[in-house]
A protein has these predicted regions:
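N-terminal Rossmann-fold NAD(P) dinucleotide-binding loop
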Residues: 14-15
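C-terminal amphipathic/interface module of NAD(P)-dependent oxidoreductases
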Residues: 52-56, 254-289
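NAD(P)-cofactor binding segment of oxidoreductase domains
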Residues: 61-104
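Conserved Rossmann-fold NAD(P)-dependent oxidoreductase catalytic core, especially the SDR/UDP-sugar
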Residues: 90-130
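Catalytic helix-loop patch of NAD(P)-dependent Rossmann-fold dehydrogenases
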Residues: 115-155
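Glycine/proline-rich active-site loop of Rossmann-fold NAD(P)-dependent oxidoreductases
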Residues: 136, 149-151, 161-172, 201-212, ...
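NAD(P)-dependent short-chain dehydrogenase/reductase
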Residues: 143-187
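Mid/C-terminal beta-alpha module of Rossmann-like enzyme folds, strongest
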Residues: 205-252
Length: 289
């Protein structure tokens, strides 16, 4: 069967997924980006790319979505219009008849703050940040469209993403990283290769309407991870910076307002995923070797 993947948003995770399927004869790839320069770059890589910034619909949407069998959504929701793909093209998507799989990339932020406690795939969503509220609203809008139009939507709640060119190893190289210390602060992480594993497993075994926590096996305090990566890179450990007095942007401070440890049982029990990088230790060791 000929398959066509369309990615609304050709960011870090989408490009990683594309790199795994682009070389296969039965896949064609298309997607959207926000600038002509990026469009031209993707075109040189053989990716059919359309300009879309979420403010106005694609003029050639029928042609763009012709033959699409799989769709990945990684565009973030906005304050005024919610999910930009649904706002601009919800009706167009509802008329597609050949879609086998839709993946919506969300965030574990929909669970809110749990004071360092555990959450799992069944934990009720209780976002405590505006960012989490917008993501949860977008998730629900996608599921509503899925129900009304019988679309195979799947939700992927991602932890903090790292991988080649992205993560603590890059911040340490550039000198941007600060070791913020806050008691009982936990973040869950996921290597981009394992996100791709999960997406491919879901494509192979669709379960429309299902949600998955996409994180590794070991949530950890951010300062602990920074120390570990410093040691791997043979760098001196950074000085502790107390969260209460740290000079942080409002966005960064908002991340530290939530602490939880996220379980990943469903990607293993239902999709059969065996993580390549089960903890940050294996993941960063592979990146800096």
């Amino acid at each position: 069967m000929q398959k066509k993947l369309f990615c609304f948003g050709l960011g870090y995770t989408a490009r990683a997924l594309i790199s795994h399927v682009a070389g296969e004869d039965d896949w064609t790839i298309a997607g959207t980006c926000r600038s002509p320069d990026k469009r031209d770059k993707f075109a040189r890589q053989g990716i059919e790319c359309h300009l879309f910034d979420g403010s106005i619909p694609l003029r050639n949407i029928v042609d763009a979505l012709s033959g699409v069998t799989h769709m990945l959504i990684s565009t973030p929701p906005g304050e005024s219009r919610g999910d930009p793909v649904l706002a601009c093209h919800g009706n167009d998507l509802s008329r597609l008849t050949n879609l086998h799989w839709i993946g919506y990339l969300s965030t574990t932020g929909v669970y809110g703050d749990h004071d360092g406690g555990w959450v799992d795939d069944e934990t009720p969503e209780t976002p405590t940040s505006r960012r989490g509220e917008l993501r949860l609203a977008a998730e629900r809008d996608w599921l509503m469209l899925a129900e009304s139009a019988s679309l195979p939507v799947h939700l992927f709640r991602l932890g903090s993403i790292y991988g080649p060119g992205r993560g603590q190893q890059e911040g340490l190289k550039s000198g941007r990283t600060k070791k913020i210390v806050k008691p009982n602060q936990y973040f869950s992480r996921i290597h981009v290769e394992d996100i791709v594993q999960v997406l491919l497993a879901s494509m192979a075994h669709p379960d429309p309407g299902q949600s998955y926590n996409v994180v590794d096996d070991l949530p950890a305090p951010p300062d602990q991870v920074i120390d570990y990566v410093c040691d791997l890179m043979s760098l001196p450990r950074l000085p502790d910076v107390d969260f209460e007095t740290a000079d942080l942007s409002p966005l960064m401070r908002s991340f530290y307002s939530e602490s939880k440890r996220v379980r990943n049982d469903r990607i293993k029990s239902e999709l059969g995923v065996k993580l390549k990088h089960p903890t940050y230790r294996e993941g960063f060791a592979a990146l800096v070797k």
